[in-house]
Amino acid sequence: MIEPKKSPAFQRILSGYLTFQLKKHFHRIWLDDDRQRKGQGLMLVNHSSWWDGLLVFYLNRHVVKGDSYAMMSRKGMEEYGFFRKIGAFSVDRDSSREVVASLRYAEERLKEDKTVWIFPQGDEEHVEKRPLTFF
């Protein structure tokens, strides 16, 4: 399993760049969140576009405002290593040993009252694809 290696300096730079890019590419980002949350938790989100991982980072910085981690495929981590700097850790679905290690890592973060983001579908899929499949 590839563990995160967070970099506060990189996160500040990415946050500024990402805010600029989101304003450039989206009319608005709207969040309907009337839940009364206490502490952090497990966030399960759809994975329908390449923006998703970056939106998770943005939402954590501007809405959740906590220490956050996200599960990402090993292949994706190897291809886009910068995600390590913002809290991504890997999972290799082809290795049951690594799946267990990744789930244990997520469990440890949750016990520390951190937020853990998971894309249960495992792959980028069209939002209307049915039936939903989980890795």
What are the language-model segments listed below?
Residues 1-17:
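Helix-enriched interaction subdomains in cytosolic or periplasmic regions
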Residues 3-4, 19-21, 41, 81:
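Homeobox/homeodomain signature
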Residues 12-28:
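Short coil-to-helix leader/linker segments, especially the first N-terminal amphipathic alpha-helix
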Residues 28-135:
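Soluble catalytic domains of membrane acyltransferases
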